[in-house]
Amino acid sequence: MRILAIDTATEACSVALWNDGTVNAHFELCPREHTQRILPMVQDILTTSGTSLTDINALAYGRGPGSFTGVRIGIGIAQGLALGAELPMIGVSTLMTMAQGAWRKNGATRVLAAIDARMGEVYWAEYQRDENGIWHGEETEAVLKPEIVHERMQQLSGEWVTVGTGWQAWPDLGKESGLVLRDGEVLLPAAEDMLPIACQMFAEGKTVAVEHAEPVYLRNNVAWKKLPGKE
């Protein structure tokens, strides 16, 4: 099985390829340069792996939340690639991707993900990983004021690992929560960490056709234009 993953939802730009268990990945910090960097990165990964788009089984994309512009760029490019090669698509949460990153780096199984959402809010989620490697908690994804995050944290207990830029943007976020918090050493999502999630979704048949691939902004006032003729 071969899955190509692309993410441009934050300041980072990343591409990764799952090739029957072998992972090739490229990660760059390139604010405002996503459109210039992402396609060369895709081509580099494919060339290095001796793979073409027609060899791929599915294309995973970072569906958000994150920068509105970044999410749009990522899904637009992913749709273009998938359309040309007639590939199904898999939308992967950027928040869950960071949780997977914390597990890869330090074995975290209980993760609090927070991305700075600007406008005095954070993109938030609480994840727990089961013994089969499946992450649970997608239903907790939301855009929240820090004080609401604090209320959510007070309903939890024990030790949790923190990931994302939200903890830097709001350094008091976890104070007086009653939780034991450890830094997961993951600030931004990476396509490499999308792959295990995407592989599981692919195995479960959770793919969508190109015209049905959509972002998840978590803010309801952002419109998304589908591909022409696919309304």
Curated annotation (Swiss-Prot):
Cellular location(s): Cytoplasm
Xref: PANTHER family: TRNA N6-ADENOSINE THREONYLCARBAMOYLTRANSFERASE, TRNA THREONYLCARBAMOYLADENOSINE BIOSYNTHESIS PROTEIN TSAB
CDD domains the record matches: ASKHA_NBD_TsaB
Origin superkingdom: Bacteria
Transmembrane spans: none
Keyword Cytoplasm set for record: yes
Source species: Escherichia coli (strain K12)
Observed effect of gene inactivation: Appears essential for growth, since no null mutants can be obtained. Conditional depletion of this gene leads to enlarged cells, which display highly condensed nucleoids. The TsaB depletion phenotype is suppressed by overexpressing the response regulator RstA.
Alphabetized InterPro entries for the sequence: ATPase_NBD (IPR043129), Gcp-like_dom (IPR000905), T6A_TsaB (IPR022496)
Note: TsaBCDE are necessary and sufficient for tRNA(NNU) t(6)A37 threonylcarbamoyladenosine modification in vitro in E.coli.
Gene3D superfamilies given in the database record: 3.30.420.40
Any one annotated GO CC term: EKC/KEOPS complex
Subunit record text: Homodimer. Interacts with TsaD and TsaE in a mutually exclusive manner; TsaD is the preferred partner. Also interacts with TsaC.
The protein, known as: tRNA threonylcarbamoyladenosine biosynthesis protein TsaB
Coiled coil, from the record: none
One Pfam family of this chain: TsaD
Record keywords: Cytoplasm, tRNA processing
Gene Ontology biological process terms in this record: maintenance of translational fidelity; tRNA threonylcarbamoyladenosine modification
